[in-house]
């Protein structure tokens, strides 16, 4: 109907007004959805006052100035139709109608086609998937005509990959079954419309997220408490995106945001948790949790905190002697649970053999005196039938694999006094002696001395003094007569009880004679083997005197020998003898009382002139480690002077070094620049006119070569050792001179002061008195060779009588006084070559008087 009507109108207008012509530019139009387009309606002709109108495809007249479809009258001859943001409903034939003043009309039409351009409606990027799941990549395409969709990856059609995991679904989505991390990348969704040759594509980024995996480097971590120690727990995590880490302790989160938390420190990625100043409270199960958008996983770490043992409880105890029992207790903490042991300063109780052992652990000593019970962290030590010797310090030690701790406790035992000391004490008239009464008591005891029932000291016994110390009382007696020898009583009293002990002061005697066992003669010497005197006289032997002479001589030669050195081997050596000569020798012993009986003479004959005895060798390694000083100790010369020593040496399994010849007076040989860490042997032979001695053999090993080597650039590298020593000596002497001059002018002392006093007669600052050691025995160096005894005078003891403080004696005070007698005698032999050199003999002060310890030798 519409077309017929339009045709009639057209014929009408053509027939009536051929002069009006209407054109629309463009004559046709295609618009894509969403695009805009305008059309111009132009009128040609002479008509005036024309009206130009636009009509929509549904025949409605379009109003001017609408929002989306706009009509604008430009002038009398044109009008514009504009379609903004076209949609499918806007398609159709639009008509431009021109009406003249006389009512005639002319029109033109334009067919507007609107199509949907190929577009991607729902194709987000990126699209993320979890590894292992079936991924569907979304790509919705809209167009007027159904498009053809092609999926590409890395420039290739995914279908051509022949990977069965890749499927294009009916809705043109791409499905990837069991997507992998390697499938990640850019996928292109490409649409094509063959009819229009239209093509469009969208690149979609596919991200494959990998669930985290986490593993603890150590599932169990050990630490030690209370050492200021830090421990680090580490978890290694993997996944995509990179997982974030968090930690829990026994299920409670450990926050990573507290800046003032000095206990827990996290690394930058929180994969490491450091626990500072570990203590027992830190022992727990720690869980590290790795989390990302694909999931989470955790791992557990058990922190085991061990603790060194610590003694937590001890208690001192007090008991009475003979009390039935007392128990000492020791408690300790630690992990692992410590074992507790007991000891004193003199015995290790826990390591002693036990008579029994039961559980709970109970150990009893063989004598049944001590019982140790242990259970868990507590141990007790029970002492039965308490003795005073049980008093003192007890140490309990707690030990485990981490360490140990010890704590002391004290057992106080109260007991009546107990007295000890040498019962028999030897001395002689005029010689001071100490009678020692050792006292063991708790509480402290009061000590008294008695003689024949009379309390000492008293006016009847002016030659007696008493010195007291916390552990002993000393009765100093200077016998004046036989009446001073005899019994003395020491009595100690405390609130527990009392105890007395009788001492006997015995008059000492000179020693009996030593017995000569045998004489080993050589050409010019003889070794005399002897036994000590059966009776020492109550005091120790100080020296031995050997006398000898050749048969036919009247006078005896003599020499003194120190008792300590002689008693070590029981041998004295006589020197300066003639070869092939018969001699007699005898011995006597000297103690503080005087020279004892002389032994019977023993005859012997020296050997003829012969080769010398081999020297005795002693080695002393040098500080550098590869040098040695070999000392040559001369033995018997065989009756003929030694001419020289022959020395040869070598490293074992090596060639001998050139022989060294030493003068007869040499007492050592230095071997230098030896091989490091090598074993050497040395042979030394003594030679006289009769021949060579047997070789003395000595073996030694040098040190390993040191690793540190001194720098060549040392300032002293160019100086010899002797030059360096000389420089040091000169510097030292100069310092001494400066110090001596300073002391002379400032303090009136020093070497210059000594010269001034002795040569110039100037009085020294110390000339007001002299020092004298109390009870010190010595032998003079003058011609008389008589023993001299220095004793304290009454004037020296005056301060003590005036109430001054007594000097506390020790084991060397007071000292004994030997009887006056010859110490060394020497005759003038007929032969000048046998003349012995004078010998100086000195006694050892602290050996002058001793109590008799073995009464069988009296």
UniProtKB/Swiss-Prot annotation:
<dbReference type="GO" id="GO:0034109">
    <property type="term" value="P:homotypic cell-cell adhesion"/>
</dbReference>
<feature type="domain" description="Ig-like C2-type 3">
    <location>
        <begin position="212"/>
        <end position="302"/>
    </location>
</feature>
<dbReference type="InterPro" id="IPR003599">
    <property type="entry name" value="Ig_sub"/>
</dbReference>
<feature type="binding site">
    <location>
        <begin position="161"/>
        <end position="165"/>
    </location>
    <ligand>
        <name>heparin</name>
    </ligand>
</feature>
<keyword id="KW-0677">Repeat</keyword>
<dbReference type="GO" id="GO:0098685">
    <property type="term" value="C:Schaffer collateral - CA1 synapse"/>
</dbReference>
<dbReference type="GO" id="GO:0050850">
    <property type="term" value="P:positive regulation of calcium-mediated signaling"/>
</dbReference>
<dbReference type="InterPro" id="IPR003598">
    <property type="entry name" value="Ig_sub2"/>
</dbReference>
<dbReference type="GO" id="GO:0001928">
    <property type="term" value="P:regulation of exocyst assembly"/>
</dbReference>
<comment type="subunit">
    <text>Interacts with MDK. Found in a complex with SLC39A6, SLC39A10 and with NCAM1; this complex controls NCAM1 phosphorylation and integration into focal adhesion complexes during epithelial-tomesenchymal transition. Interacts with synaptic plasticity regulator PANTS.</text>
</comment>
<feature type="topological domain" description="Extracellular">
    <location>
        <begin position="20"/>
        <end position="721"/>
    </location>
</feature>
<dbReference type="GO" id="GO:0009897">
    <property type="term" value="C:external side of plasma membrane"/>
</dbReference>
<dbReference type="GO" id="GO:0043005">
    <property type="term" value="C:neuron projection"/>
</dbReference>
<keyword id="KW-0472">Membrane</keyword>
<dbReference type="GO" id="GO:0071219">
    <property type="term" value="P:cellular response to molecule of bacterial origin"/>
</dbReference>
<feature type="disulfide bond">
    <location>
        <begin position="235"/>
        <end position="288"/>
    </location>
</feature>
<feature type="glycosylation site" description="N-linked (GlcNAc...) asparagine">
    <location>
        <position position="434"/>
    </location>
</feature>
<dbReference type="GO" id="GO:0043025">
    <property type="term" value="C:neuronal cell body"/>
</dbReference>
<dbReference type="InterPro" id="IPR013783">
    <property type="entry name" value="Ig-like_fold"/>
</dbReference>
<feature type="glycosylation site" description="N-linked (GlcNAc...) asparagine">
    <location>
        <position position="348"/>
    </location>
</feature>
<dbReference type="GO" id="GO:0014012">
    <property type="term" value="P:peripheral nervous system axon regeneration"/>
</dbReference>
<keyword id="KW-0393">Immunoglobulin domain</keyword>
<feature type="domain" description="Ig-like C2-type 4">
    <location>
        <begin position="309"/>
        <end position="414"/>
    </location>
</feature>
<dbReference type="InterPro" id="IPR013098">
    <property type="entry name" value="Ig_I-set"/>
</dbReference>
<feature type="glycosylation site" description="N-linked (GlcNAc...) asparagine">
    <location>
        <position position="316"/>
    </location>
</feature>
<dbReference type="GO" id="GO:0031100">
    <property type="term" value="P:animal organ regeneration"/>
</dbReference>
<dbReference type="GO" id="GO:0008201">
    <property type="term" value="F:heparin binding"/>
</dbReference>
<dbReference type="GO" id="GO:0007166">
    <property type="term" value="P:cell surface receptor signaling pathway"/>
</dbReference>
<keyword id="KW-0597">Phosphoprotein</keyword>
<dbReference type="GO" id="GO:0009986">
    <property type="term" value="C:cell surface"/>
</dbReference>
<dbReference type="GO" id="GO:0031175">
    <property type="term" value="P:neuron projection development"/>
</dbReference>
<feature type="disulfide bond">
    <location>
        <begin position="139"/>
        <end position="189"/>
    </location>
</feature>
<feature type="binding site">
    <location>
        <begin position="152"/>
        <end position="156"/>
    </location>
    <ligand>
        <name>heparin</name>
    </ligand>
</feature>
<dbReference type="GO" id="GO:2001260">
    <property type="term" value="P:regulation of semaphorin-plexin signaling pathway"/>
</dbReference>
<dbReference type="GO" id="GO:0042734">
    <property type="term" value="C:presynaptic membrane"/>
</dbReference>
<feature type="glycosylation site" description="N-linked (GlcNAc...) asparagine">
    <location>
        <position position="489"/>
    </location>
</feature>
<feature type="topological domain" description="Cytoplasmic">
    <location>
        <begin position="740"/>
        <end position="858"/>
    </location>
</feature>
<dbReference type="GO" id="GO:0043069">
    <property type="term" value="P:negative regulation of programmed cell death"/>
</dbReference>
<dbReference type="Pfam" id="PF07679">
    <property type="entry name" value="I-set"/>
</dbReference>
<dbReference type="GO" id="GO:0030424">
    <property type="term" value="C:axon"/>
</dbReference>
<keyword id="KW-0325">Glycoprotein</keyword>
<feature type="disulfide bond">
    <location>
        <begin position="437"/>
        <end position="490"/>
    </location>
</feature>
């Amino acid at each position: 109907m519409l077309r017929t009507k339009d045709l009639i109108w057209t014929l009408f207008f053509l027939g009536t007004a051929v002069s009006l012509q209407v054109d629309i530019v463009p004559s046709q139009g295609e618009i894509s959805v969403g695009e805009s387009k305008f059309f111009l309606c132009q009128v040609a002709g002479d008509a005036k006052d024309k009206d130009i109108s636009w009509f929509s495809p549904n025949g409605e007249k379009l109003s001017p100035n609408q929002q989306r479809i706009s009509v604008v009258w430009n002038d009398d001859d044109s009008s514009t139709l504009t379609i903004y943001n076209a949609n499918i409903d806007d398609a159709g034939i639009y008509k431009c109608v021109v009406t003249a003043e006389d009512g005639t009309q002319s029109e033109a039409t334009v067919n507007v086609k609107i199509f949907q351009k190929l577009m991607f409606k729902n194709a987000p990027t990126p699209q993320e998937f979890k590894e292992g799941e079936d991924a569907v990549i979304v790509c919705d395409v809209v167009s007027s005509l159904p498009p053809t969709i092609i999926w590409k990856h890395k420039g290739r059609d995914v279908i051509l990959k022949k990977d069965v995991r890749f499927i294009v679904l009916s809705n043109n989505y791409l499905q990837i079954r069991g997507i992998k991390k390697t499938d990640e990348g850019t996928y292109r969704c490409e649409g094509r419309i063959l009819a229009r040759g239209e093509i469009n594509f969208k690149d979609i980024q596919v991200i494959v997220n990998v669930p985290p995996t986490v593993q603890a480097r150590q599932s169990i971590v050990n630490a030690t408490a209370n050492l200021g120690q830090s421990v680090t727990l580490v978890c290694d995590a993997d996944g995509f995106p990179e997982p974030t880490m968090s930690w829990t302790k026994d299920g409670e989160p450990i926050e990573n945001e507290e800046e003032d938390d000095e206990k827990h420190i996290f690394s930058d990625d929180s994969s490491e948790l450091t626990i500072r100043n570990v203590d027992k409270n830190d022992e727990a199960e720690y869980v590290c949790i790795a989390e990302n958008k694909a999931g989470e996983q955790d791992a557990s770490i058990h922190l085991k905190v061990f603790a060194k043992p610590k003694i937590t409880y001890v208690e001192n105890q007090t008991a009475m002697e003979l009390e039935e029992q007392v128990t000492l207790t020791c408690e300790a903490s630690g992990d692992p649970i410590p074992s507790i042991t007991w000891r004193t300063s003199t015995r290790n109780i826990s390591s002693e053999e036990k008579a029994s052992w039961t559980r709970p652990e109970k150990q009893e000593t063989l004598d049944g005196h001590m019982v140790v019970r242990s259970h868990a962290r507590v141990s007790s030590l029970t002492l039965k039938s308490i003795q005073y010797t049980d008093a003192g310090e007890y140490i309990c030690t707690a030990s485990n694999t981490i360490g140990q701790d010890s704590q002391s406790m004290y057992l106080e035992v109260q007991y009546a006094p107990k007295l000890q000391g040498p019962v028999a004490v030897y001395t002689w008239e005029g010689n001071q002696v100490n009678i020692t009464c050792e006292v063991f008591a708790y509480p402290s005891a009061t000590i008294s001395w008695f003689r024949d029932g009379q309390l000492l000291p008293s006016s009847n016994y002016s030659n007696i003094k008493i010195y007291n110390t916390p552990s002993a009382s000393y009765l100093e007696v200077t016998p004046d007569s036989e009446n001073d020898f005899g019994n003395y009583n020491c009595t100690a009293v405390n609130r527990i009880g009392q105890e007395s002990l009788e001492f006997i002061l015995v008059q000492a005697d000179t020693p009996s004679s030593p017995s000569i066992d045998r004489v080993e003669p050589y050409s010019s010497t003889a070794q005399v083997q002897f036994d000590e005197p059966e009776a020492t006289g109550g005091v120790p032997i100080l020296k031995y005197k050997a006398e000898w002479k050749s048969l036919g001589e009247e006078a005896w030669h003599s020499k003194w020998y120190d008792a300590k050195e002689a008693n070590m081997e029981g041998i004295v050596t006589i020197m300066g003898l003639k070869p092939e000569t018969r001699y007699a020798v005898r011995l006597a012993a000297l103690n503080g009382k005087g020279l004892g009986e002389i032994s019977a003479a023993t005859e012997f004959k020296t050997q003829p002139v012969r080769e010398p005895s081999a020297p005795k060798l002693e080695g002393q390694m040098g500080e550098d480690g590869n040098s040695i000083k070999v000392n040559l100790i001369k033995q018997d010369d065989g009756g003929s002077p030694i001419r020289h020593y022959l020395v040869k040496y070598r490293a074992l399994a090596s060639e001998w070094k050139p022989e060294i010849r030493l003068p007869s007076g040499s007492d050592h040989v230095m071997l230098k620049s030896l091989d490091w860490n090598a074993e050497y042997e040395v042979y030394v032979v003594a030679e006289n006119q009769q021949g060579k001695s047997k070789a003395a053999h000595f073996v030694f090993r040098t040190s390993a070569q040191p690793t540190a080597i001194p720098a060549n650039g040392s300032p002293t590298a160019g100086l010899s050792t002797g030059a360096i020593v000389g420089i040091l000596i000169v510097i030292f002497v100069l310092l001494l001179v400066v110090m001596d001059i300073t002391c002379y002018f400032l303090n009136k002392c020093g070497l210059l002061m000594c010269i001034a006093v002795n040569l110039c007669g100037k009085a020294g600052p110390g000339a007001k008195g002299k020092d004298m050691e109390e009870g010190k025995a010595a032998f003079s160096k003058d011609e008389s060779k008589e023993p001299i005894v220095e004793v304290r005078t009454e004037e020296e003891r005056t301060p003590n009588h005036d109430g001054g403080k007594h000097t506390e004696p020790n084991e060397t005070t007071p000292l004994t006084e030997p009887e006056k007698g010859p110490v060394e005698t020497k005759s003038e032999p007929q032969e000048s070559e046998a003349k012995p050199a004078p010998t100086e003999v000195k006694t050892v002060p602290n050996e002058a008087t001793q109590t008799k310890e073995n009464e069988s030798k009296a």
